[in-house]
Regions:
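Residue-level signal for inorganic ion chemistry
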Residues: 61, 82, 137, 214, ...
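Pseudouridine synthase
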Residues: 69, 139, 144, 198-238
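Intrinsic disorder/low-complexity segments
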Residues: 163-196
């Protein structure tokens, strides 16, 4: 029975701006703590896509019935900003690992756009050995830490876009490329050939893409080595960094006021799903798990609602709708 002294458990999404150094599971625990301190009833909390402790940015936090949709966030595309420092490769492919190789080469700034273009589309990528991928039931990072040699299986991922944000340039070198006569002309003042020590990129990627691996491969394609020194997720599925709130701000707000106005509705995680409006009788049938027939709607996934409140996700095929996932929201009950 609900505790009358506690606020009802919320249902929806919090978009957290996860700080660097905090794991996704730790972020979930922190939100649970904030809800308890805010006087809310026990609430189921989950996240919509792991963000490494060394990364920061958008982490969708699912509350209550929205946790039933958290898996959809795992399949959603993501957008990241990240910086590659050239010259060193580490075992973890980020700044926390041990340097395993060095290169004195730096890529020409002018060469970078053409190389980035080769990574757009479906590519084959080898995940980092320091990753959560399971190998024979064990996490790859646990095997790597124990000193085992690991062969990571390449996977197909999609890079929807990859663009340069800005670069950090070293002292300019001057081009010794030949003139039209195929040799340098001492009377011509040559333009400096700018070399990049680091570059910041923005990548829009499919599920399963490892930014650390992408950074490694971009550096290799530029004829050098590199590792990630900065990583921020700016979009996950429909959720953007403009909607995100820091954990510190969330804790401060919860001390003096309700946080309901920070919570996005459950359907915010389904912005690409068309709605199907139910009447009370069809809503009752859906809640009982019955099939709806003779619907004029197109095939595919639909969000069924009653009085603008989500009732279920329905899969329609040939005019027949079956329940994929039902929602037990308190406002649905008649």
């Amino acid at each position: 029975m609900p505790d009358p002294e506690k606020k009802p458990a919320p249902h929806g999404w919090l978009v957290l701006d996860k700080p660097k150094g905090l794991g996704s599971t730790q972020a979930v625990a922190a939100v649970k703590r904030v809800l308890r301190q805010g006087g809310y009833a026990k609430t189921k909390v989950g996240h919509g896509g792991t963000l490494d402790p060394l990364a920061e940015g958008v982490l969708p936090i699912a509350l209550g019935e929205a946790t039933k949709l958290a898996g959809r966030m795992l399949d959603a595309s993501k957008i990241y900003d990240f910086t590659i420092a050239f010259g060193e490769q580490t075992d973890t492919l980020d700044g926390e690992g041990e340097v395993v190789a060095r290169s004195d080469r730096r890529p020409p700034v002018a060469a970078i756009p053409a190389v980035l273009a080769h990574f757009v589309g479906e590519i084959e990528q080898v995940p980092p050995v320091y990753s959560a991928i399971r190998i024979d039931g064990k996490r790859a990072y646990d095997l790597a830490r124990s000193g085992e040699e690991i062969d990571m299986t390449p996977r197909r991922v999609t890079i929807h876009s990859l663009t340069s944000r800005h670069g950090e340039r070293s002292e300019p070198l001057y081009s010794t490329f030949a003139t039209s006569a195929s040799r340098p002309d001492p009377e011509i003042a040559y333009e400096p050939l700018e070399m990049a020590d680091a570059i910041t990129l923005r990548a829009h990627v499919s599920k399963g893409t490892y930014i650390r691996s992408l950074a490694r491969d971009v550096a290799h394609a530029l004829g050098t080595l590199g590792h990630v020194t900065y990583l921020r997720r700016i979009k996950a599925g429909p959720f953007r960094e403009e909607q995100a709130i820091s954990l510190d701000s969330l804790e401060e707000i919860a001390k003096g006021a309700a946080i309901e106005n920070l919570i996005l509705p459950l359907e915010a995680g389904l912005d690409d799903i068309p709605a199907l409006i139910l009447d009370p009788d069809s809503a009752q049938a859906v809640r009982q798990g019955r099939v709806l027939s003779d619907l004029p709607h197109p095939d595919g996934l639909h969000l069924a609602t009653l009085h603008a409140v989500p009732v279920a996700l329905l899969e329609i095929a040939g005019g027949t709708a079956k329940v994929v996932r039902g929602f037990n929201l308190p406002d649905v009950a008649e």
